[in-house]
């Protein structure tokens, strides 16, 4: 395959990898008509402005949480084991309600008409500081008795976990049956998380999984379009007996879990109602309303939902809820990126270093493809050896394209050359390249994972551009092993394109560039060996099969 084809295939891979979501956006979820028509008075409560917070601080080994004492909202969540993007001296902050962005978790109880029964009343807690000393730490927020109902909101944080259990304890002293539901929400604005860029841009926004609708992204842009179209409400509504919903961003997520893996669904009293929308205050809400069984006079009841707010670590989230690992955004190539990451993870478990695991994975992929690529590289070597004869044909027939093509086809037949044979290696590598790109880009396991020396974060670009420069050198070396173009313009492009691609790779994750460098080095060794073998055979006058 000549360099023109190589360039074309490489460009196609980059376009698919980077621009797939823009070229083929995820179809907009269409809620069931009867569900979309439903209205609840909870809307007004849900869209109330975030009031100033009276903070309660909870510190565990994994997180530092700030809860608003009055509303009971989880207003700030710092992940203590992860460093901030671009600032290793600070921990990563997931939730926040400051000037820079709004991203909070809310929960409340609704009456039969959908009204927040504690609106304007507020909770209180016995103290303002909580620290994990055992396996769990509990924060109990108590509200004044309202219409005969005594309500506590209880947060339970667990050691070495990013799961937070949010429970309502209800005592009905009203003398009549209480019909309530609990509403759990993730609310955020449209601000871009730190570290987003053109080559490092990932989906940010609501996600939902239900058995009926499977996994879906409900993008901010779709909700914005609904709002701009003049609809009275811009939202996605669905009823479901189980599932999960929330918000995701690069490497991190926050989701309400309706059914823990191997456990019972919180929707046992009736289908839960999922509602994802853009609110009138231009914040975005992903909420679920959980119906409670009727609470008889004098009886007590509780309802609890787990909130997972933390990293998208595959081995962790896969054990929290069914299909929660789908929230790890591999784009359109999840079917290929997921098994690639599984293999990479197995190698890491053995080797103990993600960088060397990538090197070994590259060798394995190269070995698997060897039987096919070897025949293709031999075809390229034959084409290279036949280049002088091709030039002679071009000079002999000049502008007579028909005669020139006939002579070239006869030469290919005589020399046993498949002119398309060289395309196969690149075609085979494109899905691997794209799949590995997303596997490396989306996996929080590689976030701030070192390889050696100057590479301290395989998920981010090489800070000194050493790997991209090495990659450019390997691409230049490959051009001399490929059949030389007879067209002067192609010859110039052959020298320029390695530089162009290496500049593009300045912005790619170092782990991906490492894969491509190792792959190029292996390819160079393979092509050099084949070229030398064929040249030796031709010098001896042998016919190469």
UniProtKB/Swiss-Prot annotation:
GO terms for molecular function: membrane insertase activity. Its main location: membrane. Keywords: Cell inner membrane, Cell membrane, Chaperone, Membrane, Protein transport, Transmembrane, Transmembrane helix, Transport. GO terms for cellular component: plasma membrane. It comes from the Bacteria. The chain crosses the membrane at residues 350-370, 424-444, 461-481, 498-518. GO terms for biological process: protein insertion into membrane; protein transport. Pfam families: 60KD_IMP, YidC_periplas. Interacts with the Sec translocase complex via SecD. Specifically interacts with transmembrane segments of nascent integral membrane proteins during membrane integration. Belongs to the OXA1/ALB3/YidC family. Type 1 subfamily. This is Membrane protein insertase YidC. It comes from Neisseria gonorrhoeae (strain ATCC 700825 / FA 1090). The lineage of its organism: Bacteria, Pseudomonadati, Pseudomonadota, Betaproteobacteria, Neisseriales.
């Amino acid at each position: 395959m000549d360099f023109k084809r190589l360039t074309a295939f490489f460009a196609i891979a980059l376009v698919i990898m980077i621009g797939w979501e823009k070229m083929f956006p995820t179809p907009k979820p269409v809620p069931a008509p009867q569900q979309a028509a439903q209205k609840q008075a909870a809307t007004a409560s849900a869209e109330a402005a975030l009031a100033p917070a009276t903070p309660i601080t909870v510190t565990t080994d994994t997180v530092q949480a700030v809860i608003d004492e009055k509303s009971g909202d989880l207003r700030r969540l710092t992940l203590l084991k992860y460093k901030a993007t671009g600032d290793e001296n600070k921990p990563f902050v997931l939730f926040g309600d400051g000037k820079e962005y709004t991203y909070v978790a809310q929960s409340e109880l609704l009456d039969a008409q959908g009204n927040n029964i504690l609106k304007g009343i507020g909770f209180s807690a016995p103290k303002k500081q909580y620290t994990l000393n055992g396996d769990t730490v509990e924060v109990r927020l108590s509200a004044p008795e309202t219409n005969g109902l005594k309500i506590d909101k209880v947060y339970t944080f667990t050691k070495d976990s990013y799961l937070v259990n949010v429970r309502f304890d209800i005592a009905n002293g009203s003398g009549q049956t209480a019909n309530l539901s609990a509403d759990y929400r993730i609310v955020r604005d449209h601000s871009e998380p730190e570290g987003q860029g053109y080559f490092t841009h990932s989906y940010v926004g609501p996600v939902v999984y239900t058995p009926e609708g499977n996994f879906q992204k409900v993008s901010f842009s779709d909700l914005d379009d609904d709002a701009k179209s003049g609809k009275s409400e811009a939202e996605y509504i669905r009823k479901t007996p189980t599932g999960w919903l929330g918000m995701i961003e690069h490497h991190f997520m926050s989701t309400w879990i309706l059914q823990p893996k191997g456990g019972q669904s919180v929707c046992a009293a009736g289908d839960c109602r999922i509602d994802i929308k853009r609110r009138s205050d231009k914040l975005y809400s992903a909420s679920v309303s959980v119906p409670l069984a009727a609470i008889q006079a004098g009886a007590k009841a509780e309802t609890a939902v787990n909130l997972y707010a933390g990293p998208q670590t595959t081995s962790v989230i896969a054990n929290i809820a069914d299909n929660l690992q789908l929230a790890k955004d591999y784009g359109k190539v999840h079917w290929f990126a997921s098994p690639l990451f599984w293999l990479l993870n197995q190698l890491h478990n053995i080797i103990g270093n993600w960088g060397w695991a990538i090197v070994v994975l590259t060798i394995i992929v190269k070995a698997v493809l060897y039987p096919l690529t070897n025949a293709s590289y031999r075809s390229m070597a034959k084409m290279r050896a036949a280049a002088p004869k091709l030039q002679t044909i071009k000079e002999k027939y000049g502008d007579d394209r028909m005669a020139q093509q006939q002579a070239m086809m006869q030469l290919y037949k005589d020399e046993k050359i498949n002119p398309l044979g060289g395309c196969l290696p690149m075609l085979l590598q494109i899905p691997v390249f794209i799949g590995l790109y997303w596997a490396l880009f989306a996996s929080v396991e590689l976030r701030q994972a070192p390889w050696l020396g100057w590479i301290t974060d395989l998920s981010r670009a090489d800070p000194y551009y050493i790997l991209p420069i090495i990659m450019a050198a390997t691409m230049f070396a490959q051009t001399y092993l490929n059949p030389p173009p007879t067209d002067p313009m192609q010859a110039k492009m052959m020298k320029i394109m390695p530089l162009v691609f290496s500049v593009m790779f300045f912005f790619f994750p170092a782990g991906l560039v490492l894969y491509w460098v190792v792959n190029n080095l292996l390819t160079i060794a393979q092509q050099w060996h084949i070229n030398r073998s064929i040249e030796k055979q031709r010098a001896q006058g042998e016919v190469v099969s």
